[in-house]
Amino acid sequence: MLTRNPIVPENHVSNPIVDYEFNQDQSCLIVSTPKSFDIYNVHPLKRIMSQEMPDAGTIRMLHRTNYIAFVSTKKELLHIWDDVKKQDITRVKLDAAVKDLFLSREFIVVSQGDVISIFKFGNPWNKITEDIKFGGVCEFANGLLVYSNEFNLGQIHVTRLQTDAEQVVGKGVLVKAHANPVKMVRLNRKGDMVATCSQDGTLIRVFQTDNGVLVREFRRGLDRTSIIDMRWSPDGSKLAVVSDKWTLHVFEVFNDAENKRHVLKDWINIKYFQSEWSICNFKLKVSKGSNDCKIAWISDTGLVIVWPNRRLADTFKLNYNDDEHVWWLQLNQRNEIPL
């Protein structure tokens, strides 16, 4: 049953969301605005901290600790903020506009321009390797760094950052992921698989991170589209995907029998008819001007989609009917994100 908390107007000109992201286990959401940054518990949705900070742009938090990283909107400065001490513990001048920012207990990874910079988290604070040239797409989680190739944008590199080794960035694996440029990469929580999609948006592929072997190839649809976000379930068994067709798809990674296939798959030997489709999907109701969202898994069968333009968080339940052997998605709750 869908329950609704009060919905705020679509346009928030006075205090728009500048940036937002979930922490590493997706249990918290951090949001920056022109006035402050705020941290929320994702489920149930509740603001747990607010800090006046009119200069915060791109922002990330380290697990559920007191450490927050953000980039100034006025200057290319990376701040590491200690929320217990209510002060910066360090600042670093950057060379270009930041595309993305990733935190672990050992490293801070910053993608800016056409390079990735890696810093050691702690004291002393220093850059620990030469900048890595890349093709504009990257992800860092569980000590693994995945980034698109500088020259062939359909290929990705997967490498592990070594904390104690003399060579921080290992040799890694080169994966030929797509014919078109890679749009997005997502690591699962174990770090043994990476999901990729291209700018074409029709196919999502899953590869093993240790050897680059293709595990699954999913078809989102036939028409070209742009993938907005995709995330792994906590146990790594499912992958949720939202595109600008504004449909939420859920794919089964381990049990391929659960994914749908075309009725002509046994009759026509064409790749399209052999494709694996999502186990279920949900058509999202999107208002005019909504062009962004992010997914978080709150359990292996529960999801949240955050809509920054509308300041809303929708909670979904993934259900299974044992008698009919079918999955379906149910919208359970819609909450306002208070700022």
From Swiss-Prot:
Its main location: membrane. It is a peripheral membrane protein. Involved in mitochondrial or peroxisomal functions and amino acid signaling pathways. GO terms for biological process: protein transport. SUPFAM superfamilies: WD40 repeat-like. GO terms for cellular component: cytoplasmic vesicle membrane; vacuolar membrane. Keywords: Cytoplasmic vesicle, Membrane, Protein transport, Repeat, Transport, Vacuole, WD repeat. This is SVP1-like protein 2. It comes from the Eukaryota. Pfam families: PROPPIN. The gene is HSV2. Belongs to the WD repeat PROPPIN family. It comes from Kluyveromyces lactis (strain ATCC 8585 / CBS 2359 / DSM 70799 / NBRC 1267 / NRRL Y-1140 / WM37). WD repeats lie at residues 177-217, 222-261. May contain a beta-propeller domain involved in specific binding to phosphatidylinositol 3,5-bisphosphate (PIP2), leading to the association of the protein to the membrane. It is found in: Vacuole membrane; Cytoplasmic vesicle membrane.
